[in-house]
Regions:
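Short beta->alpha junction loops
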Residues: 152-158
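Short helix-loop-beta junction
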Residues: 134-152
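Conserved thiamine diphosphate
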Residues: 2-124, 133, 149
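A short, acidic, amphipathic alpha-helical segment used as a generic capping/interface helix at domain edges
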Residues: 159-163
Length: 163
């Protein structure tokens, strides 16, 4: 059995950090943690409900894989890959619906491997999660000004794809 735990990211990562560190990450337990409503998704509920440091805190813990999918298609691919992936994983998702980055699920997905979403030689924009759509829109606007921007979807924050 492979446990999946879902909870608001602000509580999942900060209130249970000692248990995540010792009982999940250090022992390389095959647990998948899903932080929902990450970032400032809970807006008006105030700073106690914002999860701005979840990625930074979990990035400092050994053996933890951190994934932030860009859209529903990538989330589906990621979940399918996690079925065969052993080890602790933190998945960060927002609260609100996100714009599609992919138009279907006909693409390759590999945990730990970034994906070039738009090619360009003038500059590179690296994004993850719902910001990938924003980066793609920015690349289109830059193209209108004669600037060719590469957009890289860094869906896996840790381990970081150094290629």
């Amino acid at each position: 059995m492979k446990p999946y735990v879902a909870s608001p990211a602000c509580f999942l990562t900060m209130r249970s950090i000692e248990q995540i560190k010792v009982d999940v990450a250090y022992s390389k337990t095959d647990v998948k943690l899903i932080g929902i409503s990450a970032g400032v998704s809970y807006g008006a509920l105030g700073m106690s409900h914002h999860s701005l440091q979840d990625i930074a805190v979990l990035n400092a813990i050994p053996n933890m894989t951190i994934i932030v999918p860009a859209d529903p298609y990538e989330t589906k691919k990621m979940m399918n890959k996690l079925a065969d992936f052993h080890g602790p994983v933190y998945i960060r998702v927002g609260r609100n619906p996100v714009s599609e980055v992919y138009h279907d699920d006909n693409f390759d997905y590999e945990i730990g491997k970034a994906k070039i979403m738009h090619d360009g030689d003038d500059l590179s924009i690296v994004a993850y999660g719902e910001m990938v759509r924003v980066a793609l829109d920015a690349a289109i606007q830059l193209e209108l000004q004669g600037i060719q921007a590469r957009v890289i979807n860094m869906h896996t924050i840790k381990p970081f794809d150094q290629e």
